[in-house]
Amino acid sequence: MGSPRLRTQFEKLYTHYNNNDSGVQIDDIADLLCCTRRNTRMVLKKMSDEKWIIWNPAVGRGKSSILEFISTPDAVYLSLARQNIEEGKLDVALELLDGNQDALLDLINNALGVSHEKGKQVVKLPYYRQLHILKPSLAIRRSEQHLVQQIFNGLTQWNKAGDIEGDIAHHWEMLSPTHWRFYIRPSISFHDGKLLAFEDIKETFLALKSNFVFAHIHSVSSPSLNIIDFALSKSDHHFASKLAQFNAKIIPTTAHTQQDYSRYPVGTGPYKISENTDKKLILTANEHYFGYRPLIDSVEVWTLPEVAPIQLKLGLEVSEGPESYSSYGEKVDVDKGCSYLLFNRKTGVAKDKNWQVYLSQVITPLMLLNELQNSQMNGIGLFNAYGLLPGLQHCLNRAKVPFTLPSKGSVVHLGYEKEHPLYPLLGKAIEQRLALDGIVLKTHPFDTLDLLCEEKTQSIDMWLRGMSLGTQCPEALLSWLFAFNEIERATPEEDFIQITMLIDNWQSSPENHFPVNEICRYLVNSDQILPLFHGWMGISENANNSIQNASCNGLGWFDFETVWIKPEIN
């Protein structure tokens, strides 16, 4: 796009000669640009190569040459700003636009969405943070969990109705409640070309044995080619459904020791990682996928932390507010989860009953929603939660328990994830409310991986967290409960045993339904968790009618492998 000096020279040339209909002299241009004749010719050649001008030099000294402008300085700077936006250099782009944030936002919105590039169908999406933790066992946030579904496969999977169906395994059978057999599709390969082997499956599940959900796996064996047997230490009539969880996706044996695997994972799924920088994540279609090859060739997720999510008007994004719900038609749905406060009743102040009652009664969803109304996140489609999942009403009609105000000057520690648009605002609102009672709140933003470290988290008194099942299947609650031990670390041992007993009872019989209602009620009634908000999710029908089959999944995204772009036919 030319050097800064060349652009300055072009601007000077354009200002002087734009309305000149007669010929120009090379000597006059040289004087204007303060260059020698030789350097002036080089400058004009570069401008011509950039397609800013048409330069037809005359032959012979003193004769007039023809200078024609085919671009303007504004167009040059606009084009350069677009290029910098593509590269994620928003600060440079804003400077080129003379600090005009509206112009910057327009350029960003124009660059995003659906496009055709070199015969390929490309979808570009904005996101407010980097996506570098894509290993299934570490995917603690829901956007990472969505991407894991695009990059990896499990032995089984849940469909949109929440029913279990085959994935890497095409059939399975329960030989006994402690012996399950899975039949594997042949010739499945990872993105790097390596064939999926028994050892990959075995090592994936042996690495998960510290998780309560998979702790009863006694051994994994292969009695014959493309057959996998699981021997369990206790009866489990629902084992096949458990294998559909996001953290049970199959990874290669090399992933367990590869240092950068979380950022550059290799799976078997419909999309593979082709780039994952601080500015951009690019997924490209897996040409050798064992299922249906995706119709979208490439998905780019741009990291745009400087731009508030509510300002981005992209039709492929989750609805960010109620102001245009009419345009979302029947595609609007409620997130299958909620934002919540998790109280540390094990090592935090909430282990004291009076503190527990005080915090759960003075911090209310309505109070926090009112504070959000006055912030930049006003209108993001949140509403009061009466239970952990939409439809549950465990918070209603609960008796108010009397409490004594804690001592003035007492300190409460609140933890939450870094790079979250809501949590700092909610933390500020909680701080202001507790200050009315003389209580000091100290907030602690955590890096995502630090959330998994018990040593770093045990001093936190309460957590701002969020959960989403991502499916209609209630068993998905197991991933939230056990994948990262967050709930266990904050729950008294005797209470957590009650939850595990409910699950043991469920898996002991094929007739038992998953106790999602009982578990959620127990967590709310014990004041372990205070549900805060549910959220609306949807795909706009207005912004881009060429995208087909785009519906919002349970993790707030649309499934990349199922959408396609309808071509325009004249």
What is the role of each PLM region?
Residues 288-328:
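Ligand-site clamp/hinge motif
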Residues 19-28, 33-39, 51, 55-57, ...:
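Ligand/substrate-recognition segments at binding pockets and active sites
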Residues 213-256, 270-275, 280:
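Surface-exposed binding/hinge segments that line
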Residues 284-287, 332-358, 362, 371:
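A bilobed periplasmic-binding-protein/Venus flytrap-type ligand-binding module shared by bacterial periplasmic
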Residues 48, 58, 358, 362-396, ...:
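Detector for C-terminal structural segments
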Residues 130-144, 239-245, 540-561:
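A structural "hinge/loop" feature
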Residues 18-21, 43, 140-142, 147, ...:
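Aromatic- and charge-enriched surface segment that lines or borders ligand/interaction sites
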Residues 125-175:
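N-terminal lobe/hinge region of extracytoplasmic solute-binding protein
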